[in-house]
Swiss-Prot record:
Induction: Expressed in the intermediate phase of the viral replicative cycle (immediately after DNA replication). Residues 1-16 form the signal peptide. Keywords: Glycoprotein, Host-virus interaction, Inhibition of host NF-kappa-B by virus, Signal. This is Late protein I226R. Belongs to the asfivirus I226R family. Plays a role in the inhibition of host NF-kappa-B and IRF3 signaling pathways. Mechanistically, promotes the degradation of host IKBKG through enhancing its ubiquitination leading to inhibition of both pathways.
Length: 226
């Protein structure tokens, strides 16, 4: 998946942002050839007053340039709403990069940890609280695999200290049974995931849901092995 395609998909429901997105994509392509200072000036012009866009810029900018500007873009945003938005958006982005471009874990972990640390330090909200909020799940209700992959990624690689799994599971169970089932499996070792376990958990569900579960577990294994 191309970066341009993914960014546009993220904002398919955002009115009035199309032109800004096109400008951003143009600048990102220029960034390969231009200096960081020039790009900073141009990006600053675009991200205000809508500072949520700063994190759309943070992701590809950091990936293109060895993370030089990551603190600049994270430190300009302090409000809780934008940080929550950024944490979810950023995690989904790096997950897609890991699957489609085969990036190594240390390379994309830094950005997620940076946002997570900022959340914990300034807002006193842990990363998992962001991921299990109703707003986050509702925003991605039609992208169930993205949600599940995000949760798996956060648990396997980001959480420090270890989160309270029971709280996460309880929150997920309220919202969507399939999310709860998959997540419960994910926090165990992948070797323990067997078809008979799925049958036990999904004995009251239909075949279509069972197939979705199998496909999702396959996706999770792929991401987990990046």
């Amino acid at each position: 998946m191309k970066m341009e395609t993914f960014l546009v998909c993220l904002f398919h429901n955002a009115d009035g942002l199309h032109q800004q997105i096109q400008e951003i994509l143009y600048l990102l392509r220029m960034h390969i050839y231009e200096t960081n200072l020039y790009l900073k000036q141009e990006l600053s012009r675009l991200i205000y007053p809508n500072r949520q866009l700063s994190f759309v810029l943070l992701m590809p900018l950091s990936l293109l340039r060895n993370w030089d500007d990551i603190e600049y873009l994270t430190d300009v945003v302090d409000d809780k709403q934008t940080l929550h938005y950024a944490a979810n958006l950023l995690t989904n982005y790096v997950l897609h990069l890991s699957m489609f471009q085969k990036l190594t874990k240390p390379y994309f972990l830094l950005a997620v940890k940076r946002v997570s640390e900022k959340l914990n330090k300034k807002q006193r909200h842990s990363f998992y609280e962001v991921l299990v909020t109703s707003e986050t799940l509702n925003n991605y209700e039609n992208l169930s695999k993205n949600i599940l992959n995000t949760l798996m990624f956060a648990v396997r690689y980001v959480f420090k200290p270890t989160p309270n799994y029971s709280e996460i599971l309880a929150e997920l169970e309220k919202k969507n049974k399939i999310h709860h089932i998959i997540f419960n499996m994910v926090i165990t070792d992948f070797a323990q995931i067997r078809e008979q376990q799925m049958d036990k958990h999904l004995c009251e569900t239909n075949n279509e849901l069972r197939q979705e579960c199998k496909e999702t577990i396959f996706d999770l294994k792929v991401v987990g092995n990046v």
